[in-house]
Each structure stands twice: as structure tokens, then as C-alpha cells.
């Protein structure tokens, strides 16, 4: 074999590998997202239950499911065929009117299990068509307009530069659970 000169240290090598992996992940996510959006963007179903069998690597299911949920403005169950049913990931979008989508999924008679967080969890269903019917009936009166909880409303004419600068002092505290102020 030939000797190749080492032109990067271990840190540079790790960064290069991680960027390569992230690029591969992004390409797989985006390809699947486009496929599923074209199949589901006109659906009137209250929950998008999407069969990803043969289309998406299971490692990317959660990434694609949350992107679909945000774009479709409805909860998503992105699953693939397994031995006795379908398994995958459940996701609901920020400000979804269903506060605990996992618990609702767990109460569906077609659910084998739903485990994880209220809006991001693993799921297994027996029959996706029966589950789709159940969700449509259960959520028939629910509007999926985003719901924003507010502490107070400020009229535009009452906003000053000093007030904005005061809020800006707290920007490092905004995170999940402590939302940035909406304007």
C-alpha cells in the first residue's frame, strides 16, 4: 500500500465525519419528507397515519415525523410494517390542541403500545386503517389551529425601544418550556 500523509488531526477528522453523516441524514429526511408530503397534503384525516415501509430508514422516523407534523399542522404517526402490525414514531406539532397525543394514542383500541413523551414517542398499531377511523371519529370536533397560551397582550403603540431592550436581557433564558415572546 501507499503511505498517505496525515493532513488532519483527530478533531478535524471527527468534525468531517459528523458533517458527512449529518448531510446523509438531511438528504434522507428531505427525500422522505417530499414523498410523504405529496401523498398526504390533501388528506382530511385528523391524524396523518403514514406507512413508511420500504421508503425510510427507521433511524430517521422521528426526524421526518416531526417535520411532517409541523408542515401538515396535525399529529403524525409514521410507521412501517412489522410482524403483527405497524411500528414507528408518533409526533405532534408545537401548540397542538391535543396536550398529550401519546395518551390519546394509547387509548386507541388499535394501539399495542405508545411509550415516551406526550408529543414524541414510539408506537405500535395493529391496524392503521382502523386506527385512522378511530382518530377521525374521536377528533371530529377538534380544530388543529395552533393554540398559543399568552400571559398578556400588548398593543403595538405601547411597545418601546426600552421595553424591547429589557426583554432582550432575558434571551438566554428562552428554551423549551420558556418560550420566546411572540410579536
Task: Locate each region found by the language model.
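A contiguous loop/helix-start segment that scaffolds small-molecule binding in enzyme catalytic cores
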Residues: 141-183
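Hydrophobic helix-and-loop "lid/oligomerization" segment in the mid-to-C-terminal part
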Residues: 1-133, 137-139, 153-158
Amino acid at each position: 500500500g501507499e503511505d498517505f500523509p496525515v493532513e488532519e488531526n483527530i478533531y478535524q477528522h471527527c468534525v468531517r465525519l459528523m458533517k458527512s453523516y449529518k448531510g446523509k441524514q438531511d438528504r434522507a429526511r428531505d427525500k422522505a419528507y417530499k414523498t410523504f408530503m405529496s401523498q398526504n397534503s390533501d388528506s382530511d384525516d385528523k391524524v396523518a397515519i403514514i406507512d413508511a415501509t420500504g421508503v425510510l430508514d427507521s433511524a430517521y422516523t422521528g426526524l421526518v415525523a416531526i417535520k411532517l407534523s409541523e408542515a401538515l399542522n396535525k399529529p403524525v404517526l409514521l410507521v412501517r410494517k412489522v410482524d403483527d402490525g405497524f411500528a414507528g414514531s408518533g409526533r405532534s406539532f408545537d401548540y397542538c390542541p391535543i396536550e398529550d397525543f401519546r395518551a390519546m394514542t394509547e387509548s386507541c383500541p388499535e394501539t399495542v403500545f405508545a411509550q415516551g413523551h406526550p408529543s414524541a414517542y414510539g408506537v405500535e398499531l395493529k391496524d392503521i386503517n382502523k386506527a385512522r377511523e378511530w382518530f377521525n371519529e374521536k377528533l371530529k370536533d377538534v380544530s388543529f389551529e395552533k393554540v398559543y397560551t399568552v400571559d398578556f397582550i400588548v398593543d403595538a403603540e405601547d411597545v418601546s425601544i426600552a421595553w424591547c431592550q429589557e426583554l432582550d436581557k432575558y434571551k438566554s433564558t428562552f428554551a423549551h418550556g420558556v418560550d420566546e415572546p411572540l410579536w
